């Protein structure tokens, strides 16, 4: 669901590269809505299908695109790691396949000896993969003439998009498909809004996901400057400053995070990693392995540099990269293989 406020304008988002290593038993209904089909011609190709599931967290039926690896049908007893890929703002559950060619990229990796995995690509609306600070107005959403998707699935009564991913989607995948079904075999990734979601969901649910990756993510939403990034950073501390930091995303983020710094800080990946460090020291689940990258011409490059500096200062291991490119599918297509390989390496030990 998008907050029913003036519709934000989508922000349009040289050669340099940096690479630094620094079960819930909810009732979920599943039904296949698309026929199985090979993702491309050839011997080692996966299949892509669409499920419709009931989400208790959102109170709505949602669509879910699922990639099954080439050997899924033949190896009837084999179990596979689960990867969850999140779309960006204004996207949908088909974008990673239709625009990102993620299925073809995964098939190519398998043909060169990569481990296989099941991939879930859920419909996240414009929900930022978080529990909103304010309850969405489903009735106003249904009356919104600009809305792009059917009201029954888009205008959800409960805006708990983090629980939807970490609980409902994972529960459906573990019960419907032959996943390995444990934390060590699950990873999550996303682009833009989905990059924010991948990192924050993994840091909020370290008992569910062992690894997370972000492409071009909104990963330091309170960052104000300097631009280009140089320490020390400046962060928004007032409502006016939060609005300035959010720019064209303000109508979304004020509904998701609120109008004061408490909600924004609680959903900041750097701050979440710092809090999780304390839980790890007290015997809690380990920190997820983290990777994130961004194009040097991307509007969010300074946010990514800030998160990299924050995690480095905290001593949180992570992999960070900058590559030529902007906030566009050409960039995400080019680098999807890197997040797949990073996640697969973490969930398979290879």
Where are these regions (language model features)?
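Bacterial N-terminal signal peptides that target proteins for export
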Residues: 2-16
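Residues at the start of alpha-helices and the adjacent loop-to-helix junctions
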Residues: 8-9, 23, 331
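Sec-dependent N-terminal signal peptides
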Residues: 17-23
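Cleavable N-terminal signal peptides
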Residues: 18, 28-29
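Hydrophobic alpha-helical membrane-insertion segments, chiefly the h-region
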Residues: 24-25, 89
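Non-catalytic cap/lid and distal C-terminal segments of serine-dependent acyl enzymes
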Residues: 32-34, 42-350
């Amino acid at each position: 669901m998008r907050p029913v406020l003036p519709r934000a304008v989508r922000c349009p988002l040289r050669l340099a590269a940096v690479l630094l290593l620094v079960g819930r038993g909810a009732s979920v209904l599943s039904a296949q809505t698309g026929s199985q089909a090979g993702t491309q011609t050839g011997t080692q190709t996966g299949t892509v299908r669409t499920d419709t599931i009931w989400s208790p967290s959102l109170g709505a039926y949602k669509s879910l695109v699922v990639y099954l690896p080439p050997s899924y049908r033949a190896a009837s007893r084999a179990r596979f790691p689960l990867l969850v890929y999140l779309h960006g703002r204004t996207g949908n559950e088909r974008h990673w396949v239709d625009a990102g060619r993620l299925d073809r990229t995964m098939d190519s990796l398998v043909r060169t000896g990569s481990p296989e995995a099941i991939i879930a690509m859920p419909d996240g609306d414009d929900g930022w993969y978080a529990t909103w600070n304010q309850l969405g107005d489903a009735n106003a959403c249904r009356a919104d003439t600009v809305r792009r998707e059917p009201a029954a699935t888009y205008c959800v009564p409960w805006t708990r998009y983090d629980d939807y991913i970490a609980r409902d989607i994972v529960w459906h995948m573990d019960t419907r498909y032959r996943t390995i079904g444990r934390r060590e075999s699950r990873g999550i990734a996303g682009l833009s809004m989905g990059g924010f979601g991948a990192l924050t969901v993994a840091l909020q649910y370290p008992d569910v996901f062992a690894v997370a990756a972000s492409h071009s993510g909104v990963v330091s939403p309170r960052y104000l400057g300097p631009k280009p990034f140089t320490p020390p950073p400046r962060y928004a501390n007032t409502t006016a400053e939060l609005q300035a930091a959010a720019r064209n995303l303000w109508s979304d983020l004020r509904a998701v995070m609120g109008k004061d710094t408490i909600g924004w800080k609680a959903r900041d990946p750097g701050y979440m990693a710092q809090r999780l460090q304390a839980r790890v020291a007290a015997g809690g689940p380990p920190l997820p392995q983290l990777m994130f990258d961004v194009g040097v011409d991307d509007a969010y490059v300074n946010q990514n540099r800030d998160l990299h500096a924050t995690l480095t200062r905290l001593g949180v291991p992570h992999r960070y990269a900058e590559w030529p490119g902007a906030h566009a599918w050409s960039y995400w297509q080019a680098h999807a293989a890197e997040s797949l390989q990073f996640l697969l390496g973490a969930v398979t030990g290879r």
